[in-house]
Structure formats: C-alpha cells, structure tokens
C-alpha cells in the first residue's frame, strides 16, 4: 500500500477519532492533488469541510487549484477569495502570486471590471512591470481607449516598456490623440535605443 492506500484504509476505521479523520482527509486532498487526481482531491477536501467546525487556508487553496486544473474557473474563484480573506484574517501576508492567480481567473472569466480593480491594487502594492502592462490590457478589453493609452503612457514613464510593438503603439496612439510631439519623441527614442527596428516603415512613422 502506498501513502494514499494507507490513508484510505484509515478512514474505514469506524471508531477513528474526529481529529485523526480530519487530518487524514486533508492529507488525502493533498496527496491526490500531487497525483493530479483532481476529482478525488476535491472529494476529500469537501469531506473535510463537512466535518470540520472551522475553515482552513490549505483546504480553500487546494479546492481552488483542483477546480482550476479542471478548467472549472467559476468554481475555483470563490474558494480562492475565501483563501485570501481567511489568510488576511489570520494575519498572513499575501504575495503577488496570490493576487496574480486571482487576476488570471478574472481574465479567463472575462470579468474585466474586477480585473481592473485588482490590477490597480496590485500596482499600488507591488509596483511590478507586469501589472502596469496588464492595466493597459484591461482597459483595451473594456474598450476604454483613452484610459488604455494613459495606462500605456504611465507604463512608459515608469520605464517598463522595452519592446517595439508597445513603443510604436504608444507613439502612434498619442499622435492620434492630438499629442503628436510626444508621440514622435517616444518613437524617436525607441529608434535611438534600438528598441524599434530602423526600417523604412518605422522611419516613415517617425517622420509623420
């Protein structure tokens, strides 16, 4: 018998103490997750919740992951929110990865309003370049063009834009918003720093 088999056998003991049964169920939830048997992981975590008088961050997190791995994102969302809220209640500090996972679910569910609020929170808390660029993407998904350009401009001003496509996009977008000088300056900087390829098309854009 492997570890899973031993724990499953343990659960068949009728006189098993409640605390031992709870530990066994939680362990099975984790072991089945390690085996990528997501349905059995969920089954044991849910059985734990039915018996336990309190909730647990490991169980909430495990349930969310298991549903996520099965592409059941709507089911994964509330368990992750519960995990984050309970962690904060217990005085635990949440990392950027915790917020990024939640934002990933919002994006998959196309819940861009919540993604926008969360992305702003992440920028304030972590000031990570990925979040600055995500802000631009969220505004684009919401068809808020002026805000999208403003977000891209803020990312540029914070020094997190280093690819040709975004340099050109920002420069042309600002020019289209009747801010041609700034747009031209950004494209010229991209050419000077070799971020934008010095070809005929890009030189024509710079000259406009």
Q: Which residues are covered by each model-predicted region?
A:
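Alpha-solenoid helical repeat scaffolds
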Residues: 1-208
């Amino acid at each position: 018998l492997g570890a899973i088999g031993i724990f499953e056998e343990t659960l068949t003991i009728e006189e098993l103490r409640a605390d031992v049964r709870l530990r066994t169920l939680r362990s099975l939830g984790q072991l089945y997750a390690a085996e990528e048997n997501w349905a059995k992981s969920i089954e044991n975590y849910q059985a734990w919740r039915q018996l336990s008088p309190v909730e647990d961050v490991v169980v909430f997190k495990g349930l969310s992951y298991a549903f996520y791995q099965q592409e059941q994102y709507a089911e994964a969302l509330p368990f992750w929110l519960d995990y984050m809220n309970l962690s904060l209640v217990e005085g635990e500090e949440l990392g950027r990865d915790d917020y990024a996972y939640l934002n990933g679910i919002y994006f998959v569910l196309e819940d861009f309003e919540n993604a926008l609020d969360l992305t702003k929170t992440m920028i304030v808390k972590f000031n990570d370049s990925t979040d600055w660029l995500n802000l631009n993407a969220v505004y684009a998904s919401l068809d808020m063009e002026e805000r999208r350009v403003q977000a891209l401009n803020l990312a540029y001003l914070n020094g997190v834009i280093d690819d040709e496509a975004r340099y050109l996009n920002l420069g042309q977008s600002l020019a289209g918003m009747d801010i041609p000088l700034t747009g031209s300056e950004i494209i010229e900087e991209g050419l000077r720093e070799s971020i934008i390829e010095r070809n005929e098309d890009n030189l024509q854009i710079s000259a406009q």
